[in-house]
Amino acid sequence: MMTADFLVSDPSSALTPAASTPALRFTSGGETLQGILHIPAGPGPHPIVVVLHGFPGNERNFDLAQALRRAGYAALVFHYRGSWGMGGTWSWGHVLEDAAQVTAAIRTDEIAGAHRLDPRRLALVGHSLGGFTALMTAADDLTIGAVASVSGFNFGAVTPTFTDPAVRRGYVEAFEEELLPLRGTSGEALVAEMEAAGDAWSLARLAPRLADRPVLLVGTSRDTATPHEIHHEPLVRAYEAHPVPRLEHHVFPSDHALSDHRVALARTVIDFLDRRLAVAE
């Protein structure tokens, strides 16, 4: 564990190898995905954090990735299919598939061995759609050591409201406004995909499969995209009721992107990982 304050202190120049930021390529669904790996200074092997961005990915949390690196974690940020210049088409299902593929690939000997990574210690940290994806991916992969959802979007809490035509239309229109960096989809297609998935995308149902892992949920009280009364508080209650014994949860007085709580977010996430992912640096 690093002893200096990772938010204001660069690593010692005596640490070797030096920190680096290589671009990586992953394959998912026949398409090539671009990733940026933030490798800490020092011999490692370094624990891995895959940082999952939201829809469409305006906030990609590179500041969090840099803070994670200074704290001793190798942080990966990547783009899903059909987003930000990547090939293929965007869909919620493709996001889930891409996250699973990348999470597996980063731990292979080819990548982990080449970049001083510890494949035995991996966490997922996601924002918004990325929070949903982090929890869903961790529930399906028992080897993921810890998971954090920040302003997570709970599809299962929203889809039942689509029986109201006005609500459904509102989501179609809201999604349409965010499609510029995405390809091959529409607001109607995204809402229809949510309806087809139904309760299978309810995050509350994941409690039994997350009960043996540390889980961090961060809500935001000034959030109009994922209001904490809908997306955060009910999920906390569901995970406490099951229970998920190593659940930690917070609500920050901030907007969806935590625009004025970036330092607090970094400290909260890294404190959680330091205690729960057993960093041994």
Give the residues covered by each predicted segment.
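Conserved alpha/beta-hydrolase
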Residues: 65-87
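Alpha/beta-hydrolase active-site loop
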Residues: 90-115
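Alpha/beta-hydrolase fold nucleophile elbow
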Residues: 113-128
